[in-house]
């Protein structure tokens, strides 16, 4: 199965804010969509995270994208909407010590995110699809498929509006 994993365009939010599940809009959606439409095969089904920054792009790529909650970004719990500089140092250190397993207070861990993202992919029955989602979802999926140890996960970085195409064994 061929998947085109697309990170949403840049969100309209102040720099330095943790915004995982915050439902903020994105900037420059039509321009990003035009670029992707020129690159992607035509007529593919499109799935999207329900958050506006993904959904708006998905709606430019397909007249009726399918929305799936499993594609939403990691839940950062009490960190949501907080400046990264204001997140308690001890909590950030705990996350750095256990990149995959640590969950922010009231949130989920990257491993939890990875489980739901893999369940989404396992549910697909099409040979090729476009998935509009978030960096965390793309990162945990690629880390799984590439067999990367959790300490290497932060090396996987994706630009806003970027496309990563992978072939996933069934």
Model-identified regions with their sequence ranges:
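Generic beta-sheet signal
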Residues: 3, 44, 127-136
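Short, active-site-adjacent cap segments at secondary-structure transitions
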Residues: 12, 53-55, 73, 137-140
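Phosphate-coordination/substrate-recognition cap region in phosphate-metabolizing enzymes
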Residues: 33-91
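Short glycine/proline- and acidic residue-enriched helix-loop micro-motifs
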Residues: 92-111
């Amino acid at each position: 199965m061929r998947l085109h994993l697309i990170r949403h365009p840049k969100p309209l939010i102040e720099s330095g804010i943790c915004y995982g599940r915050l439902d903020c809009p994105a900037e420059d959606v039509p321009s990003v969509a035009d670029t992707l439409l020129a690159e992607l095969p035509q007529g593919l089904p499109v799935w999207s995270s329900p958050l506006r920054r993904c959904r708006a792009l998905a709606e430019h790529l397909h007249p009726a994208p399918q929305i799936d909650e499993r594609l939403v970004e990691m839940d950062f719990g009490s960190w949501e909407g907080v400046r990264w500089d204001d997140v308690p140092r001890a909590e950030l250190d705990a996350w750095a010590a256990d990149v995959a397993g640590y969950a922010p207070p009231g949130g989920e861990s990257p491993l939890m995110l990875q489980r739901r993202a893999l369940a989404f992919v396992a549910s697909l029955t099409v040979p090729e699809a476009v998935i509009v989602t978030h960096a965390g979802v793309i990162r945990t999926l690629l880390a799984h498929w590439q067999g990367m140890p959790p300490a290497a996960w932060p090396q996987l970085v994706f630009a806003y509006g970027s496309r990563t195409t992978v072939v996933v064994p069934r």
